């Protein structure tokens, strides 16, 4: 494999696309056309390395690959960075785009521009990337290339007159696209003679090499004899190995030079030592300033994860630590619940991220887990003028100590076919949304901009959005600010005891209907006991809804044949006394379905 190329012959580019617009398939085509992987090793979605990515057909972890291509007798190096398309993983997109000079904007010829695509294009434009529009799936019978080109021009303002038309599935137009990448995307800029400055844009854990950093060399060069300074931590490390990225194997190299992309092994035990967005430089001759403008990923949604087998708490800790090695956005701390025992409060980027992590914990580490209802972080202003940040409903102070509660809001952009506009606006109003803008992109598609409370979108908003628009709407959001709201804590009491794992923070106007739905569902799920069980929903000390599970009766008079009625009465009275005593000291075991039911109730 050819390794070095002059900087003018390097092209660093990424692919921006919405889920399902054919991004990973196009990446496979480019890899195949450049012969980076032999036909025998080539398989579909070669850039998606996790089983869960292949099953769901989505990209979660951004991957990179180095391709060699000859054009007009010259050898070029094309560094392709595949990015995730789902809204939860937009932090992966933003850091990948920082290390590129250009991006392919891939749009499905049958669907047009989607909300997430617009968000990622704006990140690319902020980074001054050259954007090449690519219309994919042109071989489908319902493809409408001209309309989609017009759609891109109207929505994003990029000239699409000469946009490449391809079919990744049928391998049409791939050669032209590679040549367009070479002629249109600029070569990297940087000073070869300056001190080393390298941006870490991804990191992961390798069982043999430890924590690895995927870097873009901005200035200078790095070799295997060098000592490296990690500017964020101030620690120095020797270089154990340098590699070029390839989905199937790492290709060793003696050095990485200005403009190149590569993998650096420093023999570290954890990715926290090489945080994404940090700068690597030469320990003896450091660069004066680190690379600017990088924000660490912040969790957006929090949930409790508890092992069903309570003795597997330490196994869960080990599993979370292992996943954290590859996922710098995942953070967790131990917590305990009266109902569920010991577990962890885990921060996620969004609901898909939460689902993926839970599924990976169960699949890769054979854990049986239960997740509590997801929540966001609330800003609670207390009467003594102090401020407390609450992410767990059980931490909310008593009502008489609270001056006001502020909840985080997001700005949501939704693109929908106009026939579903009525249903969608009704859903947004139910979710306490405030309309900011409505814009017709063309005769059949509308773009809505709403501000919404974050806790309204973390439960089931995405599912409801898809069902009220038959799956045609696309959705993207960005956090904006905290706003004051009328929020209360809704508790569920079973046999008089508050079940802390079922508590939720909710809008005051929705508390009654949510409480009523909760107790009705719990009545169906909790098995009948030998004593009567009251299920209550309460806000503060006020009970707002109640259901009663009748006791199971044992026929204590079965062995009395005829005879005196007082004998039967005596036995029934004795039974009644026993039940009263049972009710006072009896504990109700809650089935796991009761906790899962909370997530399903609207």
From Swiss-Prot:
Catalyzed reactions per annotation: GTP + H2O = GDP + phosphate + H(+)
UniProt EC number: 3.6.5.n1
Record-linked InterPro entries: EF-4, EFG_III/V, EFG_V-like, EFTu-like_2, G_TR_CS, LepA_C_sf, LepA_CTD, LepA_IV
Bilayer disposition of the protein: Peripheral membrane protein
GO BP annotations, alphabetical order: positive regulation of translation
UniProt entry tagged with the keyword Cell inner membrane: yes
Cellular component terms per the entry's GO annotation: plasma membrane
Domain tr-type G: 8-189
Chief location category: membrane
A GO MF term: ribosome binding
Function of the molecule: Required for accurate and efficient protein synthesis under certain stress conditions. May act as a fidelity factor of the translation reaction, by catalyzing a one-codon backward translocation of tRNAs on improperly translocated ribosomes. Back-translocation proceeds from a post-translocation (POST) complex to a pre-translocation (PRE) complex, thus giving elongation factor G a second chance to translocate the tRNAs correctly. Binds to ribosomes in a GTP-dependent manner.
Name under which the protein is recorded: Elongation factor 4
Source organism (scientific name): Helicobacter pylori (strain G27)
């Amino acid at each position: 494999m050819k390794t070095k190329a002059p900087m003018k012959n390097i092209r660093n580019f990424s692919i921006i696309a919405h889920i399902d617009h054919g991004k990973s398939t196009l990446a496979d085509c480019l890899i195949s056309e450049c012969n980076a992987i032999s036909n025998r090793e080539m398989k579909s979605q070669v850039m998606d390395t996790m089983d869960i990515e292949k099953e769901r057909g989505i990209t979660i972890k951004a991957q990179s690959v180095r391709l060699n291509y000859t054009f007009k007798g010259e050898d070029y190096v094309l560094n392709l960075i595949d990015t995730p398309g789902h809204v939860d993983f937009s932090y992966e997109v933003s850091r990948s785009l920082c290390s590129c000079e250009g991006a392919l904007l891939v749009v499905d010829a049958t669907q047009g521009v989607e909300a997430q695509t617009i968000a990622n294009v704006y990140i690319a434009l902020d980074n001054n990337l050259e954007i090449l529009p690519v219309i994919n799936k042109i071989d489908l019978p319902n493809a409408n290339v001209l309309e989609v080109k017009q759609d891109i021009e109207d929505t994003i303002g990029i000239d699409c007159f000469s946009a490449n038309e391809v079919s990744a599935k049928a391998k049409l137009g791939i050669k032209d696209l590679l040549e367009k990448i070479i002629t249109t995307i600029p070569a990297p800029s940087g000073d070869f003679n300056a001190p080393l400055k390298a941006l870490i844009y991804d990191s992961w854990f390798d069982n043999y090499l430890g924590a690895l950093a995927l870097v873009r060399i901005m200035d200078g060069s790095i070799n295997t004899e060098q000592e490296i300074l990690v500017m964020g931590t101030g620690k120095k490390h020797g270089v154990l190995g340098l590699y070029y990225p390839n989905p199937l194997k790492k290709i060793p190299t003696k050095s990485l030079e200005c403009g190149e992309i590569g993998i650096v092994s420093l023999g570290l035990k954890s990715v926290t030592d090489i945080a994404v967005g940090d700068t690597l430089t030469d320990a003896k001759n450091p660069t004066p300033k680190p690379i600017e403008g990088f924000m660490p990923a912040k969790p957006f949604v929090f949930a409790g994860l508890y092992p069903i087998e309570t003795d597997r708490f330490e196994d869960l800790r080990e599993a979370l630590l292992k996943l954290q090695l590859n996922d710098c956005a995942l953070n967790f701390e131990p917590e305990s619940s009266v109902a569920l025992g010991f577990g962890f409060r885990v921060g996620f980027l969004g609901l898909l991220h939460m689902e993926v992590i839970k599924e990976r914990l169960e699949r890769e580490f054979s854990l049986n887990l239960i997740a509590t209802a997801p929540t966001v972080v609330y800003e609670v202003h207390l009467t003594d003028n102090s401020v407390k940040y609450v992410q767990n409903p059980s931490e909310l102070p008593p009502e008489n100590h609270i001056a006001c509660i502020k909840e985080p809001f997001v700005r949501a952009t939704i693109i929908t076919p106009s026939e579903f506009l009525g249903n969608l606006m009704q859903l947004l109003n139910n979710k306490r949304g405030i309309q900011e803008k409505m814009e017709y992109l063309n005769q059949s598609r509308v773009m809505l901009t709403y501000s919404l409370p974050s806790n309204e979108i973390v439960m089931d908003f995405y599912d409801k959005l898809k069902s009220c628009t038959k799956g045609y709407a696309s959705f993207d959001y960005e956090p904006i600010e905290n706003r004051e709201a009328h929020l209360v804590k809704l508790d569920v009491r079973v046999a008089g005891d508050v079940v802390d794992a079922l508590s939720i923070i909710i809008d005051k106007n929705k508390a009654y209907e949510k409480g009523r739905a909760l107790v009705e569902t719990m009545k169906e799920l909790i098995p009948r006991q030998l004593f009567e069980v009251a299920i209550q929903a309460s806000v503060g000390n006020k009970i707002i809804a109640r259901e009663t599970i009748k006791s199971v009766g044992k026929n204590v008079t079965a062995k009395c044949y005829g005879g005196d009625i007082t004998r039967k009465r005596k036995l029934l009275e004795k039974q009644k006394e026993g039940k009263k005593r049972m009710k006072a000291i009896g504990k109700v075991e809650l089935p796991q379905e009761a906790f899962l039911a909370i997530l399903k109730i609207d």
